[in-house]
């Protein structure tokens, strides 16, 4: 069966003929609506149901005035016909009736059936009633019922008794807005059944016999209405004239009212430290070193509580220790020194994230709750404040201008109207005022206004020709009639404008109309595209004709074929417009359409020069907003952009805030449809027990994690066995995402599965908030699951939830409500959500959507928090201005410009006193450390800004402000790394990850946290000379120089061991590229971390077609050299591989979470994350389909591949050479690279240095004892020449300072010179360490005294054990043997202590033989590892078709080429399966 698109068969026929009898012929036999299956990837080619016939009949209560023939008119537009005086009617109007075909559909969209009205002849209104809405829990929505406002009741009591039939124009400020008087969807209010058929009359063609009396309106409302004349009245609606916006305002107000200012649980005004579930495996035996500061006490108290200690118990112990037993712990709280962050009393210490990361001494401050500042709390007077969205949105000033202009123009129009009625002269003044009114209303000129203006001009022209002297009709009477029609047309245009766009006014009395529809009518989607208004004059000259296309989409997929419509040239009336007036008939039953269907219309111009069709603008709209279809005429802003985002066509793109330069008018039918939920099919009693193979196949398919990675065939298989899927073998997003379409039956089954599903964890529901699931019921269930997360847990996923708002059907959705609720409960959530929304405002298509949500957030936050938001925003604005001025300055002037502009920040803090840091709301700043601010010489010229901490117990805070770089991608990568680190911590694995904060504060700008005591690997390489990147010992030597004590060195080695493994795993999974020594950082405590994530997901830079990043991740031989302590502890490399593989396998178990987080960001506009191929890249790196053994083998190969990748070293060498040539000696070190300014730490200071003795060798070494600031001591040896070299360096670096005199050799007598130098050098060191803080803490002084320690040096210290200890030196091999079905798998992991007969290291490989089978048939072999006594393999050996283990022996032989090294025979029947085990090797020479 094929669909037939029916339009006017002859558009050139006269206008009168288009109202004659029309017939739609059936293409084929009727088809049951229940058989309609609506898919996504096929063109609709079948029709369902019958298309009825039109018949004509006369209705005495309606009127038509036929208009002149029009060549391009094929349908009805807004108020198509003239409307005559309100008390004059004609009997020539036509009535359209439908033959009843079938009963009302029980599913989908039902026709709006209205009760019979009373006194329907008293008024006719365009308003829409608001029926009773029972919410999402009802089985269906109720039938729309008429609703009368106070204005309606007055209208019904009035009769026209005055001869003046003009409307009254006024502005009402005190009448509360009522939804029924400004509905945006024009729902019909009344019905009238007559003799077996139903009347259907276009609202633009019908007025009833009643209306209001202007005089009585004035007498009734004269106290509340600003009277302007005798025409029209406007009422103020602060919540907007649009019902959707007004409803959203009411919803936000109700949410806010649930959280009273007096509720200290949710309105403490404090920033609580974030917590997680207590990591038992990590902190089972951990104790924290805590210093407690108490008011009126100079010395802190020292406690060492266990990690599982409750905060309130610690407070009780502190109070008991202070002999204040009368004080209650509940009245006290602990704050973190240096910040405004407070611990949560009901949580364990170890649950707080700050304790999980900070392993040093933690300083806390005990405060009384009532004395702790709650400055961010909401005040009592805010509980009853009203939410008017237009008071917070940017375009509020546009509304005011529009309203004020409209009122002014109406006054002028009224003045000229009175003058015209009195004198019948100066009609052109009237026409000019009408043009101005249309201009204010988006430059929209309706047909009714055009016809009235033309007729008015014609009357006065004929009057001048004495045309009416012989006529019974007076010119004055005709003028009154036409001006009434003109006023009515203006009135209706104002009403349509107010319902189409956001406005804070609307007409007081909207004329109502009635429409009728047989509920059994199988109606198809149909509407009229009338015109595109206000065509730019440049288009008029460039294009000879204009056309449009339209289509329907659902979930980013087209539901039907795109149709092109006829080309029409523009015309000039008041403004340029293109008038198609073309009726569009979709061959789709409305009830078969998905509820979340979107209509998209494109405007094309036919170029005069090339005759090509160029896309000029587009718009989109939901077909069924608020569960009901759109009724009547609507205006739509057209977006002047290249292409609509097909995948993101959602209501969020539909911007109704204000008219755009080009406005599209669409006339929808007067009859509406209302959505009814499908009945769920609960019967599953006939299901058979699934086959075992079927369940296994479902589990294999579930490894795809997201429907986007499933092929159509696999989707069909999964959907076929959908009722066998559960949370043990599959995920709900995969099952629902495999549905073949969104027809009524499929939706019913999806909802059935949805209700029956048991979620394994709340985060599984994240996959239901992607763009693949627009269904509101599915998204509602997803939010219900996420509501089980705590505020601190939800905080981690806010970026994805903000993106998910794009695909919500309206701003009253459960997801938006969840975000607002949590922002009221947590300042942390509110603060992060604020900056995410501020950043999202820069997204082109969803700016208005996010603006409204941001306004709602600010209303909920309260005045105090909003004041902080304003200060933070102002701070960012000043930083942006400073950055721009520094960039625009020349190289030699930049430092001067920066110093001058920093003064603006000082003025800022003089005005605001304090301000919270956007990066971290718990940090409050009060000023600028002027001398510590600088800029960096990288391409973006970022600023280093050091703020003064407002907390007297805190240190200064340094941040980097970047302008010119898009930091959103950095935010995403760091968020995903934080998620992985949290997973590791919960599994008991602390990878010592440093994850710095990063915040995008606007388009291509943002803040980056500076990590103290960190330096780039490139700088370490530069200190090692020209070929530093090629040396093996560079990193080891650097750590040795900065960790002289054995304990410090071991700690640094352990930190590097774990952090290097962690960053290897995360950078591999995320495919982080552009890795070189300039974006790898090291701290002196051993932590390694990466920065700058502009390239990820494998999008490597290329040079000459060759990728610059050719290693899976950065793990170089110099890193291995440090881990193995120069090769002395080769088993450390095995431990490193084990750690990496363990961390990798832990993350693989959470593949679904990572892929869901990435999928939810697909449409965030990130350059590196834009398609399914990017998700597939991460999927391929995670390998969720692999076993742990397979994944271990895979990642080990990647480690070896990275270790052997020489281009990495070459790339580091190139960057080092480039940096050495770029850095000018005149520039300070802190300006060469952002992180290098953190090289010096105030904690690395020296108290004193004393020479203990000297040795009379050729070099005359002096033994020096160095006392550190923490009272620790170390020893170092220096020669007299080294002292002299130090003095020369200080003279060059501090030429402006007066340095102590150095005891040169010529100052000393020839006798007893050694003892004299002993004394003089001690005196010299004492002076140097006291000359100034700048000299004492300089690089050269610190490196002189803290390098080359002789006590417990790294070379002399005992080995550091990082993994499993092996006291013996016997050779052994580690295996993991598994057996499933008939498959035997052996993972060869490591070997230890293997040697050749001469004692040298072998290049060993392993051979396997499965006995008693012939050796050649069952022989397997691994690759060889060259020259290693402790080799690592992690290779898998597989034997298939092993029916049983009993009677089989595995022979393992280790060889170095052909030389025998060792062997063992393993009886498989006694082997512990799936466990790691070390097996001894026999016959090897030790």
Curated annotation (Swiss-Prot):
PANTHER family: PHOSPHATIDYLINOSITOL 3-KINASE C2 DOMAIN-CONTAINING SUBUNIT GAMMA (PTHR10048:SF29), PHOSPHATIDYLINOSITOL KINASE (PTHR10048). Keywords: ATP-binding, Chemotaxis, Kinase, Lipid metabolism, Membrane, Nucleotide-binding, Transferase. SMART domains: C2, PI3K_C2, PI3Ka, PI3Kc, PX. Residues 1369-1486 form the C2 domain. Generates phosphatidylinositol 3-phosphate (PtdIns3P) and phosphatidylinositol 3,4-bisphosphate (PtdIns(3,4)P2) that act as second messengers. May play a role in SDF1A-stimulated chemotaxis. GO terms for biological process: cell migration; chemotaxis; modulation by host of viral process; phosphatidylinositol 3-kinase/protein kinase B signal transduction; phosphatidylinositol-3-phosphate biosynthetic process; phosphatidylinositol-mediated signaling. Its main location: membrane. One of its GO terms (molecular function) is phosphatidylinositol binding. Residues 1071-1079 are annotated as: Catalytic loop. The gene is PIK3C2G. Residues 521-669 form the C2 PI3K-type domain. Its EC number is 2.7.1.137, 2.7.1.154. This is Phosphatidylinositol 3-kinase C2 domain-containing subunit gamma. Residues 935-941 are annotated as: G-loop. Residues 1090-1116 are annotated as: Activation loop. One of its GO terms (cellular component) is cytosol. Highly expressed in liver, prostate and testis. Lower levels in small intestine, kidney and pancreas. Belongs to the PI3/PI4-kinase family. It is an enzyme of class 2 (transferase). Residues 285-371 form the PI3K-RBD domain. It is found in: Membrane. The keyword Ribosomal protein does not apply.
